[in-house]
Amino acid sequence: EVYKRQSRTVAKAAALLRENAGKVLAANALDLEAMDADSPMRDRLRLTAERIASIAADMESVAGLPSPQGETIAEWTRPNGMTLRKVRVPFGVVGMVCEARPNVTADIFALCVKTGNACVLKGGSDARHSNEAIAALLHEALGAEGIDENTFTLLPAGHEAVGALLSAVGYVDVVIPRGGAGLI
């Protein structure tokens, strides 16, 4: 069943993140090295073994949730006898723009895969190495379950990618900015 495969994919990604924490931490060290030591973004960017374990646990929690797809959230009958229902369905392609928070890469993957959506992520350039390392594991999890790896796409660093994402009308169904007012 599709819903079980989505849950397995998210759980597999969490397991891969735990198993490959060293690789992710090494990539994160490159990002931290390139960032100004006094930057207020530094703590948001920093990953530790504990933070990776927490990210994986959050992904496992999402994997364990029931699928919202197909759930009827409201139903009523009109005076003419016609029954109407509000049913949860995937958006389609979710675009996400975020700052230097590599944990968001895993979060958005888990939420999108679990809900049957594809995701295009534009992460902060400060987290480029971390995001690439995490994305490689997410792609591995997708492949392990026979899901097209393009279900999750990490855009290259740079402001041009944001413009391309925002102008992808007809290809991207919703864009969610996550960050401070300067991002929006």
Question: Over which residues does each language-model region extend?
Answer:
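Conserved small-residue-rich beta-alpha loop and adjacent elements
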Residues: S61-G64, P68-E145, V172
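Short alpha-helical
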Residues: K23, N103, H129, E160, ...
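Short beta->alpha junction loops/turns
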Residues: T48, E99-R101, G124, G158, ...
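Buried hydrophobic positions in well-ordered alpha/beta secondary-structure cores of metabolic enzymes
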Residues: R5-Q6, M59, V94, G116, ...
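Conserved NAD(P)+-binding/catalytic subdomain of aldehyde/semialdehyde dehydrogenases
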Residues: V93, I147-I184
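N-terminal Rossmann-like NAD(P)+-binding subdomain of aldehyde/semialdehyde dehydrogenases
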Residues: E1-K86, L111
